Amino acid sequence: MDTDELRARFDRDGFVIVRDFLTGQAFEEVRENVERYVRDVVPTLGPGKAYYQEKDRPETLKQLQGMAVDPFFEAYRQNRRWIDLAEAILGEPVEAGEPEWFNKPPKTEHVTPPHQDNYSFNLNPPNV
């Protein structure tokens, strides 16, 4: 992976796609823990932590917030592989916030309008 090229594309386009960043066992570990979290933890969460396109249809789960309540995801945000990639692309030190998960189930009609993440984060300086 050429991080200089990724950084140049990020600077030019404002985003990058990193293909095959997680593969094999690393991917399986995350996939299995997301499935476990959805199955075992989500039913215990209070309001505002899990969002569905249609509340009565679990397969329409579209967003999870506050995932640091789970030890796997709390520890995972310190994964050096992610941090090193972010720092290489952004060109500055990064601090991983609380893990969140976003999904667009097939045939989802919910659109995410343009927005500024720092409206919620309130970082100063606003490096998000």
Would you name each region that the model predicts?
Residues M1-D13, R19-L123:
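Non-heme Fe(II)-dependent double-stranded beta-helix
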Residues N127-V128:
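Surface loops at the rim/top face of extracytoplasmic beta-rich domains
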